[in-house]
């Protein structure tokens, strides 16, 4: 059944006009963009129109995730070519790809940013404008679907880019290297996708290469990714062990053989023809179909009924019923997932069209995905609960009880309905890019309603309103202007001045500058930024270039929130921090070459931390100075002691206002004698505080002052870590009427905390801490001994385990609570076709024990991992790879601290 749309797609791709546009777009793509005008001006309604429902059902927001060099960009280029989007196949080695459009990407042959592309599969034809339902036994891939594709990086330094993209995906294609199998970075991204509950299919690539082992890779999917592999295709090797020429489809019981060329010429064989052409492959295909039906029957009751309807004949089950069963199992949220597996060789143009059919047949449309989490007025829940009004009713009841009022439920429901009617659209900004021609582009995913051109967008994170002058549909680095971005789609807003990555944008009806309460507090789940571990100094060439440099750095931070900028108080140097060496190198390229900042960057350094070795006594400081021409006076008492995040917390003191843990430090604020009351608006107040200063402002000012002091240690000037600061604010001693402004309180807290850090007892003081990394190294058996010796002796690392297959969630690099509760899958119970060349040939048993893959899990100081890749490659004959993430900061031993300090000062031994 997949064969018909596959052939139709090939024919349509040949015949379609590529119009006069330099983009080479199908004219119907442009028409579909214009068709979005129908959505303009209509206020949001929970009952989506029939036309919109049809459009949404035929929309797929998917991502491509994989280890570096697994073939993500190569596969994407083939997808664009076969969909009719491009007229030639882009090549990574030539630097002619559509998705890798940054100069740094084309120079290095790697993906750095997540490129967003929209195309149609199968390519649109004149009759594809309607949204009539499909016949029951017709697969979804028979009609054209809109595919919004995100090509993500595979390099460990760009993990934040991957997380940023995963947040807005509905489904994903995970590409595996058929030679290397499941690699460390693949596991990391796979389990990140599990936390967002993203349905995934697996595509085993590079099966044309020597040493490719499809069967072994299938078993690794079971043991390392923690799911049941559903083998939907098996590779077709000429004569059983010759050249890779095609695939055998277990769903449709047919063979597909690709001719030489661009991959558009495909010859199809039914089971009888396959049996006469390749009898061994036909027998294996039958075994694959039996295994697939058996696996689905274990997880889907409807498949069991269909199996009995077909008189218990595995081969008689209709292909579309298998597709629907696979889809149900894939979209099921509970229990162990089934992982559909497909085969191909993208560089040889084999297997990409059936993969696109699988995307439209198996991956979910926006309404079928788990609802995103939102918070509104301090109440959390799902987006659909918000749009139905239930979440607003809960929030209204909570707000009424906080004010001491008792509203009727009917009145709260009426207010909720009124608020929801005013909500026209809700979107998440997941990426900000500074385009040299178009200015700042903000990539958004619309979760409800629509974003219209010239509408007012309210940013609930920054509490600012901005107009959306232009809306675009992006085709990598090219764009088509549209009038509206509808629900479930990904688009770009040009011309926004304030929006950052992770901000929530809402549109609403009415003339007010801000949405009505509580819509102004609506936030989609934000994207958490991992801590940076490398930094480099940035210096402008002259004083006149400093302003330009600051503007460029601000733009860089809007684009990539995983970068941080700080200023060293002593030297006045600007420091740029990032996730890794390559990350900072790319940031430097963007800063100097793309943003044209006239500056120089110093060498990349490691971000160490300081920690207290003992407790200080209470230190009281009174701040008494003019701030911006206004007298400010306030006081505060601070004590400092070591803090272990893993220790059990004790009951807080009754006078405690807040306990906050940030960057490995704990701040406790106590206010004895402060009589806290909640007013009618739900705001905490105290009669002892001067007008204009509520409890929230007091708490925030003290926290900010303390954080400013902790950003700089007393001995080595590195940020503090593992520090507990107790701030005591006594209104009788530390409050001076209207002079105690938030600025004065913040300054008093900073002075008291800094003094307490300097007052640590002699002999205690502070010690240096260094980042320790969780490292997973993949090598073959022959290199294992040399690599283990290098890690444990030369680099001062600690080996955790040596395993042939280590599931990543057990190593601490990432965690997925659902996987931890399920028992591991026995690879021997998994169906996998035999690999060619398994038997001994010329006296060599492949795979031999010497090249059997092994995994080393270790904890190693980051300093020893700088530039480690070239050492690993020399130890493993170029075959070793590794991935690492920050585990924790650990206190250094005295000799190690002395050596590091000597190196930082430039001393020589």
UniProtKB/Swiss-Prot annotation:
UniProt keyword terms in alphabetical order: GTP-binding, Mitochondrion, Nucleotide-binding, Protein biosynthesis, Transit peptide
Binding of GTP, residues: 66-73, 151-155, 205-208
Stored Gene3D superfamilies: 3.30.230.10, 3.30.70.240, Elongation Factor G (Translational Gtpase), domain 3, P-loop containing nucleotide triphosphate hydrolases, Translation factors
Ranges of Polar residues composition bias in the record: 127-148
Places the protein is found: Mitochondrion
Function: Mitochondrial GTPase that mediates the disassembly of ribosomes from messenger RNA at the termination of mitochondrial protein biosynthesis. Not involved in the GTP-dependent ribosomal translocation step during translation elongation.
GO molecular function terms noted in the UniProt entry: GTP binding; GTPase activity
GO biological-process terms attached to the record: mitochondrial genome maintenance; mitochondrial translation; regulation of mitochondrial membrane potential; ribosome disassembly
tr-type G domain residues: 57-367
Classification via InterPro entries: EF-G-like_DII (IPR053905), EFG2 (IPR030851), EFG_II (IPR041095), EFG_III (IPR009022), EFG_III/V (IPR035647), EFG_V (IPR035649), EFG_V-like (IPR000640), G_TR_CS (IPR031157)
Pfam families: EF-G_D2 (PF22042), EFG_C (PF00679), EFG_III (PF14492), GTP_EFTU (PF00009)
Transit sequence range: 1-15
Cellular component aspect of the GO annotation: mitochondrion
Protein's UniProt name: Ribosome-releasing factor 2, mitochondrial
Family: Belongs to the TRAFAC class translation factor GTPase superfamily. Classic translation factor GTPase family. EF-G/EF-2 subfamily.
Region (Disordered): 121-148
Organism, scientific name: Aspergillus flavus (strain ATCC 200026 / FGSC A1120 / IAM 13836 / NRRL 3357 / JCM 12722 / SRRC 167)
């Amino acid at each position: 059944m997949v064969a018909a749309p596959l052939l139709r797609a090939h024919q349509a791709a040949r015949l379609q006009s590529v119009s006069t546009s330099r983009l080479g777009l199908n004219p119907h793509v442009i028409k579909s963009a214009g068709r979005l005008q129908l959505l303009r001006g209509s206020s949001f309604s929970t009952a989506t129109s029939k036309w919109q429902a049809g459009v949404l059902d035929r929309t797929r927001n998917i991502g491509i995730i994989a280890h570096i060099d697994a073939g993500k960009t190569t596969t994407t280029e083939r997808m664009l070519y076969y969909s009719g989007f491009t007229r030639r196949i882009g090549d990574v080695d030539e630097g002619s790809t559509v998705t890798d459009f940054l100069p740094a990407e084309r120079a290095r042959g790697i993906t750095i940013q997540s490129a967003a592309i929209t195309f149609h599969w199968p390519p649109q034809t004149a009759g594809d404008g309607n949204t009539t339902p499909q016949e029951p036994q017709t697969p979804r891939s028979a009609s054209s679907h809109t595919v919004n594709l995100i090509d993500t990086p595979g390099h460990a330094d760009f993990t934040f880019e991957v997380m940023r993209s995963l947040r807005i995906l509905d489904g994903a294609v995970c590409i595996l290297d058929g030679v290397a199998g499941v690699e460390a970075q693949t596991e990391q991204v796979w389990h990140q996708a599990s936390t967002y509950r993203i349905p995934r299919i697996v595509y085993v690539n590079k099966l044309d290469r020597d040493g490719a082992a499809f069967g072994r890779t299938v078993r690794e999917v079971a043991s390392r990714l923690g799911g049941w592999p559903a083998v939907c295709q098996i590779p077709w090797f000429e004569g059983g062990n010759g050249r890779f020429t095609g695939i055998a489809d277990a769903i449709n019981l047919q063979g597909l053989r690709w001719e030489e060329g661009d991959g558009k010429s495909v010859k199809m064989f039914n089971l009888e023809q396959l049996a006469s052409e390749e009898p061994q492959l036909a027998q294996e295909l039958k075994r694959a179909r039996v295994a697939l039906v058996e696996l689905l029957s274990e997880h889907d009751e409807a498949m069991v009924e269909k199996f009995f309807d077909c008189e218990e004949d595995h081969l008689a089950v209709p292909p579309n019923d298998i597709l629907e069963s696979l889809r149900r199992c894939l979209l099921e949220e509970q229990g162990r997932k089934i992982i559909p597996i497909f085969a191909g060789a993208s560089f040889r143009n084999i297997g990409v069209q059936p993969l696109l059919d699988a995307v439209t047949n198996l991956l979910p449309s926006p309404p079928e995905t788990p609802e995103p989490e939102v918070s509104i007025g301090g109440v959390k829940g799902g987006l659909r609960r918000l749009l139905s009004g239930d979440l607003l009713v809960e929030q209204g009841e909570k707000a009424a009880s906080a004010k001491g009022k008792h509203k009727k439920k009917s009145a709260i429901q009426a207010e909720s309905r009124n608020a929801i009617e005013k909500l026209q659209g809700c979107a998440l900004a997941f990426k900000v890019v500074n385009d040299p021609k178009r200015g700042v582009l903000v990539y958004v995913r619309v979760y409800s309603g629509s974003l219209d051109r010239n509408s007012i967008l309210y940013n609930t994170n920054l509490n600012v309103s901005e107009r959306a002058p232009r809306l675009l549909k992006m085709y990598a680095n090219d764009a088509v202007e549209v009038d509206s971005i509808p629900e479930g789609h990904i688009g770009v807003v040009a011309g926004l001045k304030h929006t950052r990555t992770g901000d929530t944008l809402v549109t609403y009806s009415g003339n007010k500058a801000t949405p009505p309460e509580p819509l102004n507090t609506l936030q989609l789940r934000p994207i958490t930024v991992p801590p940076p571990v490398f930094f480099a100094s940035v210096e402008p060439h002259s004083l006149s270039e400093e302003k330009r440099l600051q503007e460029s750095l601000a733009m860089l931070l809007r684009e990539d929130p995983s970068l941080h900028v700080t200023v060293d108080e002593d030297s006045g140097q600007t420091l740029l921090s990032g996730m890794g060496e390559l990350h900072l190198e790319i940031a430097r390229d963007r800063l100097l070459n793309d943003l044209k900042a006239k500056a120089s960057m110093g060498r990349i350094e490691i971000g160490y931390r300081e920690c207290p070795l003992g407790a200080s006594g209470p230190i009281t400081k009174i701040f008494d100075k003019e701030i911006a021409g206004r007298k400010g006076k306030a006081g505060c008492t601070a004590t400092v002691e070591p803090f272990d995040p893993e220790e059990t917390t004790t009951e807080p003191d009754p006078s405690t206002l807040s306990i906050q843990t940030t960057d490995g430090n704990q701040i406790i604020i106590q206010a004895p004698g402060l009589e806290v009351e909640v007013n009618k608006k739900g705001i905490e107040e105290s009669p002892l505080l001067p007008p204009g200063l509520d409890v929230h402002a007091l708490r925030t000012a003290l926290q900010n002052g303390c954080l400013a002091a902790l950003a700089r240690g007393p001995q080595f000037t590195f940020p503090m870590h593992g520090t507990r600061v107790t701030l005591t604010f006594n209104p009788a001693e530390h409050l001076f009427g209207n002079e105690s402004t938030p600025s004065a309180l913040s300054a008093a807290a900073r002075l008291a905390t800094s003094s307490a850090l300097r007052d640590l007892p002699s002999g205690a003081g502070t010690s240096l801490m260094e980042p320790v990394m969780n490292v997973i190294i993949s090598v073959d058996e022959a290199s294992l001994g040399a690599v283990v010796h290098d890690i444990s002796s030369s680099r001062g690392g600690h080996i955790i385990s040596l395993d042939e297959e280590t599931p990543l969630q057990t190593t601490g690099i990432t965690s997925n609570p659902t996987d931890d509760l399920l028992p591991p899958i026995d690879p021997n119970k998994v169906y996998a076709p035999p690999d060619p060349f398994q038997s001994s040939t010329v006296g060599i048993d492949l795979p031999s024990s010497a090249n059997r893959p092994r995994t080393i899990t270790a904890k190693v100081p980051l300093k020893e991992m700088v530039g480690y890749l070239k050492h690993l490659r020399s130890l493993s004959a170029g075959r070793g790879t590794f991935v690492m993430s920050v585990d924790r900061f650990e206190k250094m031993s005295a000799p190690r601290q002395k050596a590091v300090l000597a190196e930082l000062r430039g001393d020589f031994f």
